[in-house]
Structures are given as C-alpha cells and as structure tokens.
C-alpha cells in the first residue's frame, strides 16, 4: 500500500525563526519586543522603520543554520516518518542565501529524513502531498491536499484551516486519523 505524504514547512513550524529574528532585532536596534506582543501581527508591521534590519538579519550567512528546533518537533516527525513519507517544503526564494544553511540545519536536526525529500520552493502548490503543515495561510490556501495550520503569532486570528498548536497537537491529529 502506498504511504501518504506529509509536507512540513520549516520556518515557524520546525524551526523557531521568529524567535531568533526578534532576539537579533532587539539586540541591534536596542528594542524590547516581546513575543506575546506579536499576536495577530507580523514583526515587519510593528517596526516598519526597521524592516531593512529584519531582511539584513535573514540574509546573514549562518542565520538559518543556528535556529532552535521547535519543542517536540524531532520526536514527532521521527514517529510520523515511520508511517508517512515526510517532505520538508520550505519557501527559500525570498532569501536565496538561506539554501545552504537550511539544508545543513535539516541534516543536523532531522538526520532520519531523506535529503531527497527536502524541497526548496516558493509557492507550495507545486507540492504533491496529502497534507501540508504550515504557518502561512497563503501557502495553505493554494495547497491542493489537506491544509493544517501550525499556530504562529501572525496567524492566531486565522480560522479557515484546521489548526495545530505545537508538535504534540500534530501527533494527536495524526494518531486520531489513523484509527
């Protein structure tokens, strides 16, 4: 029997990209932005005067290589990998300098995944999978399979998609549909 495919976004789903950006912005611009102040907002809209700084941080060599892994992501993805074909679908077109760092990060933190299943793309409607776990509503709305929204500060008021709030929720979601 053919295994179903799950495509998983990297930034804000597997990796805490926003936390690293906020930390760097706070240090460099002498600000005190708190993660909870971002609920329902994007960082670039909160500090439009520092939008260039945010992009500079994202373009720095090594930035994406040093991100923290989201809690429980490794263990849950490893368990899912036993029953599903897992693909990592990360939008890398906006920051082309991120390719190498993202690839190395995935190899380090998810060594049990097949690197041939790492997809660096722009729009995720090109991904042929049964499920997409992503924090970006724009990606989820163009995906042709089942869209699952991973909670992030910028999408808390989005209600069009089934939602998971962390990797334990992801595990529970897929455990419930296997029965």
Curated annotation (Swiss-Prot):
For the keyword Magnesium, the answer is: yes
Q: Which CDD domains match?
A: HAD_5-3dNT
Can the keyword Repressor be found in this entry's annotation? no
Name the coenzymes or cofactors required.
Mg(2+)
**Family matches, as SUPFAM superfamilies:** HAD-like
Top enzyme class, one word, equals hydrolase
Catalytic residue positions: 9, 11
Query: Where along the chain is Mg(2+) bound?
Result: 9, 11, 135
- Molecular-function GO term, any one: 5'-nucleotidase activity
This protein's UniProt keywords: Hydrolase, Magnesium, Metal-binding
List, in alphabetical order, the GO biological process terms annotated in this UniProt record: pyrimidine deoxyribonucleotide catabolic process
Please name the InterPro entries in this protein's record: 5'(3')-deoxyribonucleotidase (IPR010708), HAD-like_sf (IPR036412), HAD_sf (IPR023214)
Give EC number(s), comma-separated: 3.1.3.-
| Main function | Dephosphorylates the 5' and 2'(3')-phosphates of deoxyribonucleotides.
**Family to which the UniProt record says this protein belongs:** Belongs to the 5'(3')-deoxyribonucleotidase family.
Indicate what this protein is called per its UniProt record. Putative 5'(3')-deoxyribonucleotidase
Q: Which organism is it from?
A: Staphylococcus epidermidis (strain ATCC 12228 / FDA PCI 1200)
